[in-house]
UniProtKB/Swiss-Prot annotation:
The keyword Ribosomal protein applies. There is a cross-link at K42, K149, K234, K250 (Glycyl lysine isopeptide (Lys-Gly) (interchain with G-Cter in SUMO2)). It comes from the Eukaryota. This is Large ribosomal subunit protein uL2. Component of the large ribosomal subunit. The ribosome is a large ribonucleoprotein complex responsible for the synthesis of proteins in the cell. InterPro entries: NA-bd_OB-fold (IPR012340), Rib_uL2_dom2 (IPR014722), Ribosomal_uL2 (IPR002171), Ribosomal_uL2_arc_euk (IPR023672), Ribosomal_uL2_C (IPR022669), Ribosomal_uL2_CS (IPR022671), Ribosomal_uL2_dom3 (IPR014726), Ribosomal_uL2_RNA-bd_dom (IPR022666).
Amino acid sequence: MGRVIRGQRKGAGSVFRAHVKHRKGAARLRAVDFAERHGYIKGIVKDIIHDPGRGAPLAKVVFRDPYRFKKRTELFIAAEGIHTGQFVYCGKKAQLNIGNVLPVGTMPEGTIVCCLEEKPGDRGKLARASGNYATVISHNPETKKTRVKLPSGSKKVISSANRAVVGVVAGGGRIDKPILKAGRAYHKYKAKRNCWPRVRGVAMNPVEHPFGGGNHQHIGKPSTIRRDAPAGRKVGLIAARRTGRLRGTKTVQEKEN
């Protein structure tokens, strides 16, 4: 019998867990309240910080609590173009400016947004990675729904009450710069999680991986595997509908969507 393979050991956690000790906190929008639903609330960008393990910078935005005599600091995903000292307005009656938070139903068609809510009040789930954005396509006032185009290119119909930050997530073009050397990859994944360096299965011994062994590096069996395979065998293309390169032009695929 072979050893417990890497994919099985990952499920147990331990050294494979994400390195969250140095992270700055959850980046999300304000909890929706009366001030945002019926008017707007003003905050100020105090600082723009780096969050280890995240490509996009974060903005520390300070708001006056509308219900208690104190200040609240929120961590927003920074939109490209915002700066320290800038005023940020959140609410239904806020203006359409970079960094402001508005319901998508109040935005004109074609608006570029980021940190978009999937459901009303979930504080931002979509288009959050560096350089990403979603586009408001159309509104349906009767059903109070809005159609948006996501970074993947897929279209999604969401509630018009969902909020979003106006603009593009900062840090765009990050992946255009090549890593070039192993040392940079080492530090990148040291901040994220233990998944580097990744040894190929065909380079292992037969006891360590189903694709290991042989006089030359080859899989030696179909790389597709059924869904209900045991954990030690479930490697490769799991329950693949199709394999191989995608044929056809992108425009045709977009029309199908």
